């Protein structure tokens, strides 16, 4: 399921959002563990060339800074802005010059060893709107692929 929407407040554009949800036959704790190990599978996205970070301990923690290099060579300075273990949700902020990104990922337990993977990516401000006007198709494809790669990695943790 994919949504592409604009968020407005008092008629003023705030950001363009890409929202994707996927129901998977994976226990919720495994899906959450896979998300927490995103540093392993993020480089597998076709839109990414690499993920660089200081290997000092746990990757998945609030305040963790890292760089994601796109296949086009753009380096996004990223930070795990918040981690909500109780609700199995993270928020990541990233930027490259004037381009800013807000990414939220969440796992929802549906019972019977099934869960929903959710990813929402937004690009705030007019610069984000201009960026998505040119790169919207790429971003919507990445949104879907992100959940597929996350799911595939989670399946490797089942064994």
Where are these regions (language model features)?
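Hydrophobic small-molecule pocket/channel-lining residues, especially in calycin-type beta-barrels
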Residues: 24, 40, 81, 91, ...
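Beta-strand/loop substructures that line and gate deep hydrophobic ligand-binding cavities in soluble
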Residues: 95-145
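Hydrophobic ligand-binding cavity/cleft-lining segments
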Residues: 3-56
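Beta-strand elements of well-folded, non-transmembrane domains
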Residues: 26, 72-74, 123-125
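Short, surface-exposed coil-to-beta transition loops
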Residues: 17-19, 73-78, 99-104
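Eukaryotic helix-grip
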Residues: 40, 44, 83-88, 122
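A short, structured loop/turn motif at beta-sheet edges
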Residues: 25-29, 81-88, 106-116
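Glycine-rich portal/gate segments that line the openings of hydrophobic small-molecule binding cavities
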Residues: 52-96, 149-157
């Amino acid at each position: 399921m994919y949504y592409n929407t604009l968020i407005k407040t008092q008629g003023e554009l705030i950001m363009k959002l890409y929202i994707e949800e996927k129901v998977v036959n994976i226990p919720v704790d495994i899906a959450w563990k896979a998300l927490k190990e995103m540093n392993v599978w993020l480089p597998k996205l076709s839109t990414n060339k690499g993920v660089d970070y200081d290997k000092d301990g746990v990757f998945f923690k609030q305040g963790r800074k890292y760089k994601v290099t796109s296949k086009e060579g753009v380096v996004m300075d990223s930070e795990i802005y918040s981690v909500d273990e109780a609700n199995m949700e993270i928020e990541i902020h990233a930027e490259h010059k004037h381009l800013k990104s807000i990414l939220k990922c969440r796992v929802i337990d549906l019972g019977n060893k099934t869960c929903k993977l959710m990813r929402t990516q937004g690009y705030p401000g007019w610069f984000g709107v201009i960026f998505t006007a040119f790169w919207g198709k790429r971003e919507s494809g990445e949104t879907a692929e992100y959940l597929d790669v996350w799911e595939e990695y989670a399946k490797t943790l089942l064994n």
